[in-house]
Amino acid sequence: MGKYFDVSYMIQAFPQLLNYVHVTVLITVISAILGVMLGSIIAIIRLKKVPVLNQLFIVFISFMRGTPFLVQLFLIYFGVPEIMSHMGLNMRNVPGLVFVYAVFTLHIAAYSAEIMRSSIDAVAPGEKEAAKSLGMTEFQSYVRIILPQAFTMSIPPLTNLVIGMLKGT
């Protein structure tokens, strides 16, 4: 097994890898924050069944959850600049890291949308009725009562999602 796995090379390369840990952490943190925010908005739109947006987000979520991450990365990195060039926009000089942030954010948004949708559905209907009986608007009831409980319930699956994303970077 000596010619397939060289421990001395691994020990030599490890300090070089440590120089880039901050990039991995930065990609993970920024994409997780933006992805969960976008996913929460998508979840609310899906729950409210906004006519056109609901169908678009169903397709978006199915695509993002059903295709391998590497395929998504290739499609965004090579496809978006090509499409934009036909529209007269030159995206050839955009740094590759921008596309990495975009793909990770969209990927996390798709998964977190389903997590948040199920978490919001899990909040007891009586909580929503109580907020309405107190005279709260729908926005107030979401911000003050429903979303805090939903976020509490979604912490374990969101943590798993972020850990998986960290490993994926």
Model-derived features: where do they sit?
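Transmembrane alpha-helices and adjacent helix-loop boundaries
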Residues: M1-T169
